[in-house]
């Protein structure tokens, strides 16, 4: 067993040869390297698969024996300071290794087909392999310095991949935004690491935890300074895991290729912040108020992410805000002392969200031949609808991923999310109310995405997205005010002012008659695509296979954490995998499982989720058109004052959600403009004052020299006379002031 642990250091470096080989190949033999580009995809998958096998072996040993192994190499700087580099294998490490490798393999297989048309295919796989190496190195690090090194490498890879299509201004701006926002967190993390080293004199986790615990217990350290250092460490996790208020980079990160979105949101970048909190949890628990701070940030992020997802039209941005909200749940759990639930939800959410992002990539892939390759069109849910008949496999996988994220049993996220929701009652009723309410919002906005994408009819044929004002085609609206005059049911298509506000819940569907189909066929031929079919098509098997594998994970991964132990079979593998002493809320974890409490809480959570799904079906499903035909909705709002009030509330919610809570506007107008103004002021002072003084001295010296040169005339007698005259003047002044 120990023999396997001794070679665990190889795991992070297994994907790295692909990056080196592609880089050297493109530099030395670019033509041959490009001709064999599919071979590099094969080697990427192969090497990461070997890493997965090693990781699975370590995980099995961890489950059976809970053996913790650490090995370090010392690098002595001088007699008083040395750095140690090594690796640590414990339950947390083995969980993250399995998560990164399994999701990474699925994303690499998917990317082979998804990126096959792209000129940057090889560059993409080089970045991806380096991304996996960086994340694997991060989770196996044995000290804070090593974590910081790989932390920066993860940030660099995310910057390269978010801005992969750097010729697009939006992608270039997005990667810069992600980089700058994470600079704030990384700077906080560095300050926190240095502060803790100043207190404890060690970067090693075990030594650091033990020394700090003793210092705080004996009141030998300033508790405020220790809390500040811990808060700075947490700031790094806040930025990396897109927690409030450093979440603004996450939706813009969707400018990168969809496989990268899946990897970032499931197993790499956003998981790095959660991993850091989990790794440093023994430190946070001994410092007052830090746990409260972590839980507060988590619950704010839970609610904020859910509300911002309500009005998004881009399918990937909707999923991004969903990730933000779910990461809030995961961050909330360790803050309230539920360490096990946090890692459980990290696992289940990773597979479900990877499935959803790969599904969205399949949807985008099917829409691009029809609407073009611009993300504003191919990712716009307004132009979708009715895709269930064109992409049935993608629809089924996306549906299962949506149900899982909504917390529907027996799918994966139901078990982990319910555990967090139940634990919030033990911590704070206010936090519990917010967390449970957000569970309903999650079901609402996730089924909003599903219904806008797959329900009804293909809306692209009804849309005017060519920016022409004189189009006679109706633009389907999602949010805003209804057109006040009644719809003429005899017209197949009606006009609408393009400047009109979007409607809040409207998703109009129409019966397509024979004339309508003819008009659709005529309209669709105007795009001039090379594809003969003007309807979406299912993705290739290479893209569908990873999605089907992730469906299996979504169906069955939740069973590893079910706390059922009836003496015959113990399904709770996760509890044996993790260290139970860290779970602060359940010190009596060995007690028998309470079936009644579990079923009661499950009924409540599922009911709330069903309510959100029901509301989504009413406002976005095909049934909404029936309500419109029966005029049931208008019967509830016939009183003008009530309708005006409801419209104001609805538009207020829409403006809040669509404008991202005005947080980006605040950062842009207050922080960015203030910093830019300060920079311009400093630039003016440097150029006019500092440079002015320097240049002024030079100019004055020049003119003085020229004047002296003209007076001297080149004769030695003149120089002697001026020298004697100057000395005489100085002596007279000295004599005068002395007496």
UniProtKB/Swiss-Prot annotation:
Q: What class of enzyme is it?
A: translocase
Q: Which GO terms describe its biological process?
A: ATP synthesis coupled electron transport; electron transport coupled proton transport
Q: Which reaction does it catalyse?
A: a plastoquinone + NADH + (n+1) H(+)(in) = a plastoquinol + NAD(+) + n H(+)(out); a plastoquinone + NADPH + (n+1) H(+)(in) = a plastoquinol + NADP(+) + n H(+)(out)
Cite the entry's keywords alphabetically: Chloroplast, Membrane, NAD, NADP, Plastid, Plastoquinone, Quinone, Thylakoid, Translocase, Transmembrane, Transmembrane helix, Transport
- Membrane-related topology note: Multi-pass membrane protein
Cross-referenced InterPro entries: NADH_UbQ_OxRdtase_chlpt_su5_C, NADHpl_OxRdtase_5_subgr, ND/Mrp_TM, NU5C-like, Proton_antipo_N
Q: Which stretches are annotated as coiled coil?
A: none
Q: May I have one GO cellular component term? A: chloroplast thylakoid membrane
Give the EC number(s) under which this enzyme is classified. 7.1.1.-
Which residue windows are transmembrane per the record? 9-29, 39-59, 89-109, 125-145, 147-167, 185-205, 224-244, 258-278, 280-300, 327-347, 354-374, 396-416, 425-445, 544-564, 603-623, 716-736
Q: Where in the cell is it found?
A: Plastid, Chloroplast thylakoid membrane
A Pfam family annotated for this UniProt entry:
Proton_antipo_C
**Gene Ontology MF annotations:** NADH dehydrogenase (ubiquinone) activity; quinone binding
Function as written in the Swiss-Prot or TrEMBL entry: NDH shuttles electrons from NAD(P)H:plastoquinone, via FMN and iron-sulfur (Fe-S) centers, to quinones in the photosynthetic chain and possibly in a chloroplast respiratory chain. The immediate electron acceptor for the enzyme in this species is believed to be plastoquinone. Couples the redox reaction to proton translocation, and thus conserves the redox energy in a proton gradient.
For this protein, the record's NCBIfam families field holds: NDH_I_L, PRK06590.1
Q: How does it assemble?
A: NDH is composed of at least 16 different subunits, 5 of which are encoded in the nucleus.
By sequence similarity, the record places it as follows: Belongs to the complex I subunit 5 family.
Q: What is this protein called?
A: NAD(P)H-quinone oxidoreductase subunit 5, chloroplastic
Native species of this protein? Acorus calamus (Sweet flag)
């Amino acid at each position: 067993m120990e023999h396997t642990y001794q070679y665990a250091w190889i795991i992070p470096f297994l994907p790295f040869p692909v990056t080196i080989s592609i880089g050297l190949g493109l530099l030395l033999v670019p033509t041959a390297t490009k001709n064999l580009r599919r071979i590099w995809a094969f080697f990427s998958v192969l090497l990461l698969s070997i890493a997965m096998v090693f990781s699975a072996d370590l995980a099995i040993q961890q489950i059976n024996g809970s053996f913790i192994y650490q090995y370090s190499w010392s690098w002595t700087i001088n007699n008083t300071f040395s750095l140690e580099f090594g690796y640590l294998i414990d339950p947390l490490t083995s969980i993250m290794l399995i998560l990164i490798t399994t999701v990474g393999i699925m994303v690499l297989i998917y990317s082979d087909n998804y990126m096959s048309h792209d000129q940057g295919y090889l560059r993409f796989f080089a970045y991806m392999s380096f991304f996996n190496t960086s994340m694997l190195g991060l989770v196996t690090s044995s000290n804070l310095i090593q974590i910081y090194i790989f932390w920066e490498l993860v940030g660099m890879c995310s910057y390269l991949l978010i801005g992969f299509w750097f010729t697009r201004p939006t992608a270039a701006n997005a990667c810069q935004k992600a980089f700058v926002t994470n600079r704030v967190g990384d700077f906080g993390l560095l300050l926190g690491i240095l502060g803790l080293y100043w207190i404890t004199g060690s970067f090693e986790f075990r030594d650091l935890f033990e020394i700090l615990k003793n210092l705080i217990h004996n009141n030998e350290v300033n508790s405020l300074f220790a809390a500040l250092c811990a808060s700075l460490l947490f700031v790094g996790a806040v930025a990396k895991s897109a927690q409030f208020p450093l979440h603004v980079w996450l939706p813009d990160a969707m400018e990168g290729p969809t496989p990268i979105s899946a990897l970032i949101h499931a197993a790499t970048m956003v998981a790095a912040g959660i991993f850091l909190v989990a790794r440093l949890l023994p430190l946070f628990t001994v410092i007052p108020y830090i746990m409260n701070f972590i839980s507060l940030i988590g619950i704010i992020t839970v609610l904020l992410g859910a509300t911002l997802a309500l009005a998004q039209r881009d399918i990937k941005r909707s999923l991004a805000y969903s990730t933000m909200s779910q990461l809030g749940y995961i961050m909330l759990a360790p803050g309230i002392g539920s360490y096990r639930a946090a890692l459980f939800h990290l696992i289940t959410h990773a597979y479900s969200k990877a499935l959803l992002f790969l599904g969205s990539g399949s949807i985008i892939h099917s829409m691009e031949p029809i609407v073009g390759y611009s993300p504003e069109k191919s990712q716009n849910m307004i132009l979708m609808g009715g895709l269930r008949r064109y992409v049935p496999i993608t629809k089924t996988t996306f549906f299962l991923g949506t149900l899982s994220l909504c917390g529907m049993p027996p799918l994966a996220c139901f078990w982990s999310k319910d555990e967090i929701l139940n634990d919030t009652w033990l911590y704070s009723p206010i936090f519990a109310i917010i967390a449970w309410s957000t569970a309903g919002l999650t079901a609402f906005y996730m089924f909003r995405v599903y219904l806008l994408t797959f329900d009804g009819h293909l809306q692209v044929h009804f849309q005017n997205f060519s920016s022409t004002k004189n189009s006679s085609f109706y633009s389907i609206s999602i949010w805003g005010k209804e057109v006040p005059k009644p719809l003429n049911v005899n017209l197949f298509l009606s006009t609408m002012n393009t400047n009109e506000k979007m409607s809040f819940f409207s998703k109009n569907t129409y019966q397509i008659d024979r004339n309508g189909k003819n008009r659709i066929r005529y309209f669709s031929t105007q795009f001039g695509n090379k594809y003969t079919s003007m309807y979406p098509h299912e993705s290739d098997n290479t893209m569908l296979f990873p999605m089907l594998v992730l469906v299996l994970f979504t169906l069955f991964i939740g069973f590893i954490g079910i706390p059922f132990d009836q003496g015959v079979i113990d399904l709770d593998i996760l509890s044996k995998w993790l260290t139970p002493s860290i779970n602060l809320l359940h010190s009596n974890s060995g007690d028998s499982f309470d079936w009644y409490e579990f079923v009661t809480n499950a009924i409540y959570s599922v009911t709330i989720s069903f309510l959100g799904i029901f509301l989504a079906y009413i406002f976005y499903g095909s049934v909404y058109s029936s309500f419109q035909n029966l005029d049931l909705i208008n019967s509830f709002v016939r009183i003008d004052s009530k309708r005006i009030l409801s419209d104001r509330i609805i538009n207020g919610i829409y403006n809040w959600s669509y404008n991202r809570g005005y947080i980006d506007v605040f950062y842009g107008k207050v922080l960015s403009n203030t910093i830019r103004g300060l920079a311009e002021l400093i630039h003016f002072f440097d150029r006019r004052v500092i440079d002015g003084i320097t240049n002024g001295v030079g100019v004055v010296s020049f003119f003085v020299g020229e004047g002296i040169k003209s007076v001297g005339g080149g004769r030695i007698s003149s120089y002697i006379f001026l020298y004697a005259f100057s000395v005489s003047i100085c002596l007279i002044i000295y004599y005068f002031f002395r007496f």
